[in-house]
Amino acid sequence: MKVQWAKFAVVLALYLLFLVWVESWLGLIVVPFIFDVYITKKIHWQWWKDEEGPVRFIMSWVDALVFALVAVYFINLFFFQNYVIPSSSLEKSLLTGDYLFVSKVSYGPRIPETPLTMPLTQHTMPLVNVKSYVEWPHWDYRRVKGLGNVKLNDIVVFNYPAGDTLVNEERYQANDYYQMVYSIGDQLMQQNGQEKDVRAMNPLQQRHYFEQVYATGRNYISSMPGEYGDIISRPTDRRENYVKRCVGLPGQTLQIKNRIVYLNGKANKEPDNVQYTYKMKLKGEFPIDLADELGITNEDLLMYNQSGVIPLTKKAYLALKANRNLVESISINTDATYGDLYPLNAYTGWTRDNYGPVWIPKKGESIALTLKNLPVYERCIKVYEGNDLKVDNAGRIFINGKQAKSYTFKLDYYWMMGDNRHNSADSRYWGFVPEDHIVGKPIFIWWSHSPDHPGFSGIRWNRLFTFVDNIK
């Protein structure tokens, strides 16, 4: 009996420390059950051990499976989870096929908004393609105290901010819903002869025009359920996980000039393995062994074959430039792409290489609101902080029914970008990342396998157990 009391004391102490950490005394209702498991044993928790035949066999597996799923749920929620790099947006810092150990403790775990969810799923049950969570109960955002805060140039895992709305047809689920709506709306207005030159409009006229573009695109998608399915929404913690580098902190003013990120007027150090696309002409076929040597993937070569541009690090660019036998010409791709940049509901003249300046919202700080800067901050005010925002025909801004000339933010925001700068869907395209979307910090790469080389030959031994903080 003394052993049981000792076990109970240890488990109870650990559980109470956990409750102090998460600041949730509601969990005290579990204490009597812990006491019963170790001491009183009034509830026959493992009744199936008294049974014979298949019942005992089946229930032993059910018991083990339930225990494993519950353990995984709490470990993933409060301590760490696995994340695999699905795309090339952070190459060549993090590579497609890198498996990351992501710490929830580094920035503090979030109390789940949707606690009733199937472990090991993000939002959809595999095979059956139905929601893996229920939306009740829905808890407000709260973050448990962690070891620190997001720092400049940290690589961060977060929920995709623009993933609040999407269409549930599987072919389009990976598409940015808002970009899709504006793109379709713009095409339809061109076809109907309703397209106008937004550069000649004042901010209020632009607002009305883009409202029409958005409504046209949304109405079209809504009218085509056979093609797009239904328009659905997802709570914050059920949105897709993204991983990018934080290049702008709350309260900083960010501007991109000729591809370089400036913060408060000072150039931020580029990542060592930053990539841009280059226009290149070859004299012959690209040797596979040279591609492997320079870290050029099949995806990179496919892009080159389709468009004549290829993403390269500075090291790879210099090596190819010096290879006169192979390369006829090579130069950085300076094509200015205007479309689909954030904000989608205004014309700014910004490009992916020359963007801003934008002030990154900081909790407790205020900004004067004008029709010119409203498109940049409207989503923060309406969607992320839950306010009702309207603009009347006279151009006056109303927040929650009251005229507003300024706004004080309730959350901190961050600016995230991929190191593969010309091939990354990041804050330049969907805006700020609110603090309640931050998931965790990658600590190290525990496994890495190249999708270009199947089997044993694809294992990247040199990347195993590489600390992410050392990838600058």
What are these regions (language model features)?
Residues M1-K472:
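Extended hydrophobic leader/signal-anchor segments used for secretion and membrane insertion
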